[in-house]
Amino acid sequence: MSHRYSENNNFPYDNNQMVLDMILCSLVGVPQPISWDSVARLVPGYTPKECAKRFEELKSSGTSPVDNQYNPLMATGGIPLESLASYIKSSLLDPVDDQEDVTVGQGTISIIGRPGATTARKCSESDRCSSSLKGDSTTGSQGPNMVIHVCDEAKNLKEDFVCPRDLLVSEMKYFAEYLSTDAQRCEEVDISVHCDVHIFDWLMRYVKRSAPENENQEIPKLEPGNVISILISSEFLKMESLVEECIRYCHKNMSAIVATPCNMNCINANLLTRIANLFTHNEADDVKDKKDKFKSKIFCKKIERLFDAECKNADSPANASTLFRCCLCKRLLTKEAEKKIDCLPGRISIDQHGNIVYLHIRDKSWDVHEYLISLFEELKSWRDVYWRLWGTINWLTCSRCKQSFLCNESSHCQYHPEPAVYPGAASSLDSPGTGIYPCCNQKVLRFDPAQLPKGCKVRDHVVGLPGGGDNMSENPSCNFLSDLLQRRDVIAVPFSKDLNGDSGIVLSEEPSFKCDALLEPNTLYGQKTGEMNAFLSLKNISLQLKQQSLLSEEEDYTTGSEVTEDEVGDEEELSRKQAGRKVKPKRSAKQTKKHISSPSIHKKERQQEKASRDSSPFTVSLQRNKWDASRSLRFNQDAQREDDQRRMTEITGHLIKIRLGDLERVKAKEGKEQAGGIYARLEAQIKASAHSNTRQMNTEKIPRPKPRFGTGRPT
């Protein structure tokens, strides 16, 4: 075993073997593995393999060869074996995981478990390091002083700070898990911080603000230029009191902070939430942020708070956790507002207290995330998205129309500019109980139990405020209305006739559907929900079907001429044109028959049609419902499709006549209101209905068996 001489060897050359044995004997009870490279660096001239081999020899022998040489060495001022063992365990055998490198603001903190001798060896070349070692002594009840090495790479500066251990742990709780109460252990910890030197100097002055030696020094103050860096550093170091102070400062001086060249993107979600919770939506709206560094983030947190069902928000009485869209009226509603905001006329009900409630139907295809994204694409600002959403979920009551309305519909109060006119019994209207608005020719009932708002024009809703004296500014209702009026250009949505088409507003120049106070026999047992809505919609459907029927009749005689020449020959095309000319007079004759109102002609037509189509209400074309083998395939397919379309048009029209025919017949028979009241009117309707049924049975000459008993008189 060869040993090389080294000038840096602190031990005599003859004692290298003894020093190695002393080190290896102290490692006998240490758990494996052992870093033999670190052991070899302590004793020059030995390789890691030689150290491991010697360690195995000492373990197998069980005795220490340095027992006889230990006392003479100690007499000359050697190192105690216990101190050597603790030094080796702390310097060589501590796990590497004791070193931590984390971000604090714009720098890092590194806590490294290292021996004091090694630190002294590295710092001996600089006067600053030697001065820091002088401060490495204990100071009374606050424990030993800790040296913190701060390195600012951006400014190329280095500085050491000294702080008592107990004060450092109590203020910066981040170090509590790394700094042990054992004095020996604290001397072995080296703290390195990579951040701005001025920020850390501010933090250390804040930590020592209550120290007796700093009574005459001024407490450091927060400024717009340094508060963000101090906030992030203090939050990482777990300085909760300083974090709370920084958050309050940000709340009061946010406009000045965003005007400085600070990076607001380094604020994490936790700090952002705590800052945003201190802002009311009016305070957030007053923040002057030209570059939008932080204002949009505050409103994003405000939007999240609106959707929190457990959060009590002073800015918004309602929350959006139950927001949905009605598939009928297309309004966005919450669970609290769905029974107060009106829907289509057919979706009305009465609760147990006699109040009108509305029954909305949830649209399952609507997604709130897609709605917020589309709203942001439309408004281009999260601030505007918040206010639009705020106006969507909150509602007020109009003192003019006595109806609840959403805040985003504050300009949708419907009214008629002219009062309704109720003519006398001899007028041309169907019933004296029915009036008309001259402004739009819309009919209205004299006694309307629902009292729903109807009108052809809209205006602003009027909200009545409670009388209050000098404390009007502290009234929540006043503040709520003030927020609405100040941002109504963003909150309010334009009035849409499509969404209010069934609320009484006439959408076209055509006369509206006639509805009076006459009761049909089936109304004695209660009218079905949505029946009036069905009547209103069937009128528009009937108009559309009339247009479709006219188009289909014209297409019936032009289908053959649309066939291309490559599929149909010239002779076939000529014969088809001649056939079309023969059909056209039949069409005109058929139209003239429709305008004839003679009863005898109708009887003859009914008897002829009965023999051919078995009392079917639909016209059957004997020539068009057959497959013509002499024609091309395309011609027959087109004819079949047109025939199917014509049938469906006739079926739909017949169903409409079934629904509306009885009502129109009763209206035609009613000339004036009975003097006996509602009961006389009901009796007249029943008699008229029975009389019309008797006449219909007499017109159809069908032999029936003679009844055995006489028919009873209707009651």
Swiss-Prot record:
The gene is sanbr. This is SANT and BTB domain regulator of class switch recombination. Homodimer. It comes from Xenopus laevis. GO terms for biological process: isotype switching. The BTB domain is important for homodimerization and for its function in negative regulation of class switch recombination. Residues 552-573 have a biased composition (Acidic residues). The lineage of its organism: Eukaryota, Metazoa, Chordata, Craniata, Vertebrata. Residues 614-623, 690-699 have a biased composition (Polar residues). InterPro entries: SANBR-like, SANBR_BTB, SKP1/BTB/POZ_sf. Negatively regulates class switch recombination or isotype switching in splenic B-cells. Residues 552-623, 689-715 are annotated as: Disordered. Belongs to the KIAA1841 family. Residues 578-605 have a biased composition (Basic residues). PANTHER family: SANT AND BTB DOMAIN REGULATOR OF CLASS SWITCH RECOMBINATION. Residues 146-254 form the BTB domain. GO terms for molecular function: identical protein binding. Transmembrane segments: none annotated. Residues 21-59 form the SANT domain.
